A protein has these predicted regions:
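A metal-dependent hydrolase metal-coordination microenvironment
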Residues: 2-105
Length: 105
């Protein structure tokens, strides 16, 4: 019986939304696919974290821009056969938490 291997990155930032990232969502999706990963979870820094999205934007526009890295990774993942999931990294009183299982709404 052959064993199937699944490899997921559970904490990944994109330059569309996280100030610390150096690559776009699409670039990251390609890099992880080439490295043999099954999927990734995009967890860009949220509002009170190290975000690159202008905090003075109206909320709806802020959320739209925050989601761009995920959307670009998701589109590229669909094209190349990589699973891509949505999450974010929230900061509260200096502690960071990864949030999974919610959607963009």
């Amino acid at each position: 019986m052959e064993t199937q291997r699944y490899l997921y990155e559970t904490h990944m930032h994109t330059s569309e939304a996280s100030a610390c990232a150096g690559s776009t969502g699409a670039q990251m999706a390609r890099a992880y696919k080439e490295a043999g990963y099954t999927g990734i979870i995009v967890t860009d820094h949220f509002f009170y974290g190290n975000t690159s999205v202008d905090r003075s934007l109206p909320w709806e526009e802020w959320v739209r821009r925050f989601c761009l890295g995920y959307e670009h990774a998701k589109a590229e993942g669909e094209r190349i056969g990589l699973s891509v999931f949505f999450g974010w990294e929230a900061c509260y009183e200096g502690t960071e938490f990864l949030v999974y299982g919610l959607d963009q709404a």
